[in-house]
Amino acid sequence: MARRPRNSRAWRFVLSGVRRDQDGRSPALHAEEEAWGYDSDGQHSNSDSDTDLLTLPPSIPSAVPVTGESYCDCDSQNDPYCSSLHPFRQIKSCQCGEEDNYFDWVWDDCSKSTATVLSCDDRKVSFHMEYSCGTAAIRGNKMLTEGQHFWEIKMTSPVYGTDMMVGIGTSDVNLDKYRHTFCSLLGKDAESWGLSYTGLLQHKGDKSNFSSRFGQGSIIGVHLDTWHGVLTFYKNRKRIGVAATQLRNKKLFPLVCSTAAKSSMKVIRSCCCRTSLQYLCCARLRQLLPGSVDSLEVLPLPPGLKQVLSNKLGWVLQMGSNRSSQHKGDGSATTSCGSYSDSSCTPGHDNCQRKRCRRI
């Protein structure tokens, strides 16, 4: 009996049916992998290839870490993804952007999920040290009372998985509620607000597009203005936008969460000051001057006043200026004040200029 050639009409019919069946099962498989956290959060994957994950839209969580979004140009922060090394590769840490040596608050060892470990004087939090089986979170050790609060969180590990988030919330947020569930914890209810690494902003379970993605080496700034009740986010010391309003008289804390295995974040700045006339004037000056200008450099201020403002309100006057992004594309800056070290807790060189953030 002669064998029918594969380019015949019958074979084309069979192959088309197989393709339709595969297309119908593909969304269900992706949904199942996301629900259980396979591969994307450090678990074993039942797929033979990561090819499909590479085609996911930017807003969809992925097993592929986000790259190219670092505050600095250190090679370790912008290395292309390598599937044979992720997520277990060890990357040297840089110190870029870590100028402060006074911190108004750090992470609270008594208000954290079980899958978290603190280091660097409680400024660095590591999630899921071996493998991930859910969502872990931690809260700052100080309530954000009246005044102006600004802090920065640096992503010190590959950023990937179901979600890694930065935000705020009340003391009613249950940090261990989803320890066996992969989810976007911050903003899941009315008690918290969270910005995801995918660029989505979440509150009351509602998600909206807010920013571009962020990855390892990115610095996420958060400004809570309790006087006006406004929450603003920054990325790599550039303003993203207002995330929430009507937050006056709320008892809020800084929060972060992660579902990714062997992930970590670090507080590199935490400041607070009263809503004084001095602050309001500095904030207005920052609005009037071009975004790329360092207010302290261009204004004809006496040296003493310039130093006082730099110490107390430098984060207001310099945010968004070229000086705040001096490590971008500047290899000499990276070498002198942000050189590699085996530990991200190693202090910078003595000759590096440090900006103190003191209470007013």
UniProtKB/Swiss-Prot annotation:
Q: Which Pfam families does the protein's record reference?
A: SPRY (PF00622)
Q: Any idea where the B30.2/SPRY domain is? A: 84-274
Please, which domain of life does this record's source organism belong to? Eukaryota
Pathway stated in the Swiss-Prot or TrEMBL entry: Protein modification; protein ubiquitination
* Predominant place of localization: nucleus
Compositional bias of kind Polar residues: 332-346
Region annotation (Disordered) ranges? 21-54, 322-350
GTP-binding keyword on record: no
Q: Which InterPro entries match?
A: B30.2/SPRY, B30.2/SPRY_sf, ConA-like_dom_sf, FBXO45-Fsn/SPSB_families, SOCS_box, SPRY_dom, SPRY_SPSB3
One GO BP annotation of this record: negative regulation of cGAS/STING signaling pathway
Instruction: Report the locations given in the UniProt record.
Output: Nucleus
An example Gene Ontology cellular component term from the record? SCF ubiquitin ligase complex
Keyword terms of this UniProt record: Nucleus, Ubl conjugation pathway
Keyword Nucleus included in the entry's annotation: yes
Molecular function (Gene Ontology), one example: ubiquitin-like ligase-substrate adaptor activity
Domain named SOCS box: which ranges?
Answer: 264-315
Self-association state and partner proteins as the record states: Substrate-recognition component of the ECS(SPSB3) complex, composed of spsb3, cul5, elob, elob and rnf7/rbx2.
Cite the domain annotation text.
Answer: The SOCS box domain mediates the interaction with the Elongin BC complex, an adapter module in different E3 ubiquitin ligase complexes.
Its annotated function is as follows: Substrate-recognition component of a cullin-5-RING E3 ubiquitin-protein ligase complex (ECS complex, also named CRL5 complex), which mediates the ubiquitination and subsequent proteasomal degradation of target proteins.
Similarity comment: family membership: Belongs to the SPSB family.
Q: What is this protein called?
A: SPRY domain-containing SOCS box protein 3
| Organism of origin | Xenopus laevis
